[in-house]
Amino acid sequence: MLNMSNIMSNRNSTPEASNVSSLRPPSSRAIGSNHGLRASADVAALTGAQAAASRIRPSSDFYGQPQSGQVQGNAELDPQDKLAQQWIADIDQYETTLEEMAAATLDQDFKDELSAIEQWFRVLSEAERTAALYALLQQTTQVQIRFFIQVLQQMGKNHPMSGVLSPANFDKDPMSSRLSDAMGKLEVGSARNSLARPSGGANKRHSGLDQTTINTMFPDAVAAIATEKAKFTQQTGNPPPSNRNSLVDNRNSLAAPTVSGPKDDINGQNPASPWGPSDTSRPKSSTGQTPMGQFVQPPPSAGGLRSPRPPQLSSNTNIQSTTLTAAEPQLTELPLLSPYTSSGNWASMVNTPMVPTFGQTQGNNADMVANATAMKLAALSTVNNRFALDDARRYRRARSNDGAPGQSHAQHPLSPGPQGIPSTNVVMINEHGQVLSHDHVLALQQQQQQGLQQGLGGFGGHRSRPTSPGIAMPNYGSALQFTSPQNNGFLSAYDGGAPGLINNGLVPMMGQFNLGGHHAEGYLSDHSEINRGRSPRGRRGSSKPPEDPTDPTLLQDIPSWLRSLRLHKYTDNLKDMKWTDLIELDDKQLEERGVNALGARRKMLKVFEQVKEAKKEGKI
């Protein structure tokens, strides 16, 4: 019965304890006589603390699992082995932390938040900065503390103390400048895409970032890690192995897929998150997208480092949550709340409903598409940041039966009757801005009447821009209503049939009053500006008369004078001249000055003559 109890206790002992017993030196004692000793050793391993303190490090400790059954033999190997493994784990943790930092720095939302913090930090005094840093260091974990110790030691070697402590040199800090340059050269979009790719080999980082990029962003941290590796090589004679990039074994426990995920240390404990447990409550950068620092990796397999963990561990619940956290980034591209793969949909998860469920949603989507299409079409129809729609009401031209734009100067409409134009306040202006007197208006009406009496043909020679469109001819009924600009443009296609009707016999007298006619043979109007909705003088819906080119005040300012003549494109060619010298130029001299257009030169010469005449008359 004693032998059976010994056998049962031997079977119930841990596998690691059995392996340890096999490492003992050979003994002359028989196996049967050793059952009691082995049973007592197993009991001592479960209850005593002395054997656990002097145990040989089993292979399960590499997986971060606590062990209890050890032997006092080979106790002299424990300190070196434990120190070496701790050193390797620290170096590996530093590299992982550095990659996570680089990936988080590339997040645009995090960069915005960090920029706001840096701007606040710049305005602090040196004492306030020290107090702020001290308060932040109280929130760090042991992993972060060890990492900062190595980085700060390296920074103390590379940077002068005065440059680090001086608030005035904060912007000139070499690390800040290098970090800004490196971040400026990186494409955030391509970096985010590269984070979604799993590690492809031993030389590939889990983050997908180039090692050169990380070196550029955090040179002090990289140098600190290199120093630790050099110390390890000098002490042990072998370079530290990479536990994170092994092709033989996927060590997910040593290379935590998330910075915020629990990581197993050498003693089998799950330390707190290096960046604190409050990542899920971040207001900005962790909402709506995968948090930076979490990378897509294959889910833990049966041969992974978490599977051999015995079920009696008290931290089993935390282990399961860690496994879910590691696989979570694979679901970032799926619909919200969907626990299945990217090809799954809710139709395959539930029974077919009797009543359509998503009809209203589809209607809303159709409305959204229609609204987006309308907005897109409206954006495409813009010209120079304005909508190319119908003319505004205030710019619409008057109808033909409402009178002409020239009548806007009249206080009273022209009364019909054979007596002609009554003695009302009528102001008529030619294309040069000259105000026609009442006698000129009467002569104009007489010339029109004579032309109509002689016949409606024979006056369609050189058509010019209608000088005073819309002159009311009450004596001739509706036949003379063709003087409106709309009707002129409408009948321009029938020039051969009724040329005199279009021009209303105005051409003979236009030459007398300098209103166009043969003087404007360089510019023959086809009234296209009327069809385009423009007024004959290029002004839209404005009844303001053009400025007088012989105005002495206007002549003193050549650019404004040219602008009033619609010749402002030649301002650079003529602005350095005085008006007295300008009016003396001839056609050849204007061409030498850069006025290449024949029509512009003729218009200038014509205005020059007007200015000369006004000068002779003493008006200037």
Swiss-Prot record:
Intracellular or extracellular location(s): Cytoplasm, Cytosol; Cytoplasm, P-body
Limits of the SAM domain: 553-614
Ranges of biased composition (kind: Polar residues): 1-25, 232-255, 267-292
Pfam family, one: Vts1
Keywords: Cytoplasm, Nucleotide-binding, Protein transport, RNA-binding, Transport
Chain segments carrying region Disordered: 1-34, 189-211, 231-317, 398-423, 527-555
Single biological process term from Gene Ontology: nuclear-transcribed mRNA poly(A) tail shortening
Alphabetical list of PROSITE patterns matching this protein: SAM_DOMAIN
Single annotated GO MF: nucleotide binding
Keyword Chloroplast tagged: no
GO CC field: cytosol; P-body
InterPro entries attached to this UniProt entry: SAM, SAM/pointed_sf, SMAUG/VTS1_RNA-bind, VTS1_SAM
Family: Belongs to the VTS1 family.
Functional description taken from the UniProt entry: RNA-binding protein involved in post-transcriptional regulation through transcript degradation.
Subunit structure: Monomer. Binds to RNA.
Protein name: RNA-binding protein VTS1
Organism: Neurospora crassa (strain ATCC 24698 / 74-OR23-1A / CBS 708.71 / DSM 1257 / FGSC 987)
Originating gene: vts1
